[in-house]
């Protein structure tokens, strides 16, 4: 809801963060922050992706207030794990949300019930594929609910430890073509 998003944005603003808001699948970030994204993200390919796909705005807070409607997602990149963890602790008090993160120093906030796992199950319903026949692969914290939700959850060898523990299987790493090897062995053979 709009009120929850306003609270979360306020929390993120208290920390040194790169903030993004999403409406209808489009991400908005501050022009100024986009020019110094490397302060928050030391993965050049990901930084390039973000700077090339986000709509630059003068101020994220102003854009949020102008839109004046519920958003898809709020994301923040932090400069320290301590700040990320402190912000997460504050945000956990906000009702009706899901907290995740694909990167070591980020938090992604969605409405409760909005996650990759639910999306895959809904797509399966549309396509006539039962949950038991849906397989998903993941490596990060943002994949945890997905691997638990689907019929077969597979973690990559390079996945975070908690994801490996939750998965039904662990395959080779991304660099070793783990997804392809797993499908060849367990699906195609």
Regions found by a protein language model. Give the residues of each.
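Glycine/small-residue-rich loop that forms an oxyanion/phosphate-binding "nest" at active or ligand-binding sites
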Residues: 1-3
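Mg2+-dependent phosphoryl-transfer enzymes with acidic/Ser/Thr/Gly-rich catalytic loops
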Residues: 92, 107-189
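Conserved acidic, metal-coordinating active-site core of Asp-based
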Residues: 5-7, 11, 15-18, 22-137, ...
